[in-house]
Design a protein with these regions (language model features):
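Conserved "HGTGT" condensation-loop signature of ketosynthase/thiolase-family condensing enzymes
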Residues: 1-134, 142-149, 156-182
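Short-chain dehydrogenase/reductase
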Residues: 137
Length: 182
């Protein structure tokens, strides 16, 4: 196995639980990181977190030198999924706005990074609950072993009040405090 070096890290994470029963990410002002106001306005919280961290990590690397974007999420864009499902039920499956569905797909962060930076390289997203980030790291290590040099590997997740209640009721959070971030 060849050596792998981490050249840059970025994180948006929780600092305290505040009033919520889970760790909620302390988000920065995204205006400096995601300069396009229209694009920023259309992005959900999770997409902003992931894209901001990805842009920070890739800011000194020319787009043509990025060999891979490998992202991971445990459950995906939950807020957008909830928004789409609620609209689906409220509108009886008619006259739906596709934006919430499009942004609820798991590969949105990797795709946004590729579009923003004009990166035409390997781009994959792992969705596997608790093993997603590990899968992304393994893929990144294997990519480097194959000769790729500049690989972005990252993860992001969000928690909504509804998803937190569901996970609690299913017993998925026993002995842990849930958290979100990128």
């Amino acid at each position: 196995m060849c050596p792998v070096y981490i050249n840059r890290i970025a994180s948006i994470h929780a600092e305290s639980r505040n009033e919520k029963p889970y760790f909620s990410a302390q988000e920065p002002d995204y205006k400096e990181m995601i300069t396009n106001a229209n694009l920023r306005r259309r992005m959900s919280r999770m997409i902003k977190m992931g894209v901001a961290c990805g842009l920070e990590c890739l800011k000194d690397i020319p787009s043509e030198k990025v060999d891979a974007i490998i992202t991971a999420t445990g459950l995906g864009c939950l807020a957008d999924t909830e928004k789409f499902m609620n609209a689906l039920m409220d509108n009886r499956e008619q006259m739906l706005n596709p934006t919430a569905f499009i942004q609820s797909t798991f590969n949105t962060v990797g795709a946004q990074l590729a579009l923003l930076l004009k990166i035409h390289a390997y781009n994959v997203t792992y969705v596997h609950r608790g093993l997603s980030f590990e899968s992304a790291l393994i893929d990144g290590i294997m990519s480097i072993a194959e000769g790729k040099q500049h690989v972005l590997a990252g993860a992001m997740d969000e928690i909504t009040p509804t998803s937190h209640i569901i996970q609690q009721r299913l017993g998925l959070l026993k002995g842990t405090t849930a958290g979100e971030g990128a």
